[in-house]
């Protein structure tokens, strides 16, 4: 049942992500990735609201967390999970590790993308 909750939530999140990208492309053009920018920021805000509420006001049932946080927000943007992981490291006082995680994730993700592009160019 848990996998089904994540699956359905992920489908909803991905659908909203696509809609936001299309709306932003029509409204602002495609010269800057406004859609992705908005998705990453808004997903992180929503993740912070939910995580903060659960931490300070009480816990929610595991199925609800799986559906909303892993499913919907995971399908909408993985940046929200990245932001939460960074904040949790920082909140635990592991500031250096939080910085290493944040910088390393961004740098290595971009380097990985370029490596994938270069490999495909080389093979084709």
UniProtKB/Swiss-Prot annotation:
InterPro entries: FluC (IPR003691). It comes from the Bacteria. GO terms for cellular component: plasma membrane. Its main location: membrane. Na(+) is not transported, but it plays an essential structural role and its presence is essential for fluoride channel function. It is found in: Cell inner membrane. One of its GO terms (molecular function) is metal ion binding. Na(+) binds at residues 74, 77. It catalyses: fluoride(in) = fluoride(out). Keywords: Cell inner membrane, Cell membrane, Ion channel, Ion transport, Membrane, Metal-binding, Sodium, Transmembrane, Transmembrane helix, Transport. PANTHER family: FLUORIDE EXPORT PROTEIN 1-RELATED. Fluoride-specific ion channel. Important for reducing fluoride concentration in the cell, thus reducing its toxicity. This is Fluoride-specific ion channel FluC 2. The lineage of its organism: Bacteria, Pseudomonadati, Pseudomonadota, Alphaproteobacteria, Hyphomicrobiales.
């Amino acid at each position: 049942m848990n996998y089904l909750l994540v699956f359905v939530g992920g489908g909803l999140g991905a659908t909203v992500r696509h809609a936001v990208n299309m709306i932003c492309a029509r409204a602002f053009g495609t010269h800057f990735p406004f859609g992705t920018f908005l998705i990453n920021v808004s997903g992180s805000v929503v993740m912070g609201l939910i995580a903060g509420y659960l931490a300070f006001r009480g816990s929610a049932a595991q199925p609800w967390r799986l559906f909303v946080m892993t499913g919907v927000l995971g399908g909408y943007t993985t940046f929200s999970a990245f932001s939460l992981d960074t904040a949790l490291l920082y909140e635990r006082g592991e500031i250096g590790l939080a910085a290493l995680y944040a910088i390393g994730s961004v740098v290595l993700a971009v380097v990985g993308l370029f490596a994938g592009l270069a490999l495909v160019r080389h093979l084709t």
